[in-house]
């Protein structure tokens, strides 16, 4: 191949290098994104704002039915002694249950003309936020870590749940879950650095 042929390939080679160099940091970004405390804090702030808005509505903005949500209480002594896989299961199942609860409340609100539109906006934001958090945790590897061997699954305690019958209680639980179990788990997973 002559000099002209090599020069013709140079722009193509430079383009390939540029695409490769720009693509590599992006591939690793999602796993680290949840490790940036500002990301989780943004979701916590949105949940807290929604909780504050619903505190002001009459009778806590009744949902008209009980919706099952994860219990957000954390026994720190027990949490420190248990394995990361168990934490992953608790967080993954809790997030799935919260997502179902928010989707259910979204459906209930769609059928109600009595509640202000601002409440619908907060529920919609929560649904979107939970989807984003699920994606971020999936990139961190929580879903894989939450899948445990059969012998571990039989000894694992079932997820503790409570019922929420108002939007206020639902958003309080959502906020507490993010500030509690989710923040604890992501902090540990990011410190381990094995992701």
From Swiss-Prot:
GO molecular function: cytokine activity; erythropoietin receptor binding; hormone activity; protein kinase activator activity
PANTHER family in alphabetical order: ERYTHROPOIETIN (PTHR10370:SF0)
Organism: Oryctolagus cuniculus
One GO cellular component term noted in the UniProt record for this chain: extracellular space
Transmembrane segments: none
Known glycosylation sites: 52, 66, 111
Keywords: Disulfide bond, Erythrocyte maturation, Glycoprotein, Hormone, Secreted, Signal
PROSITE patterns on file: EPO_TPO
Signal peptide stretch: 1-28
Protein name as annotated: Erythropoietin
Principal localisation: secreted
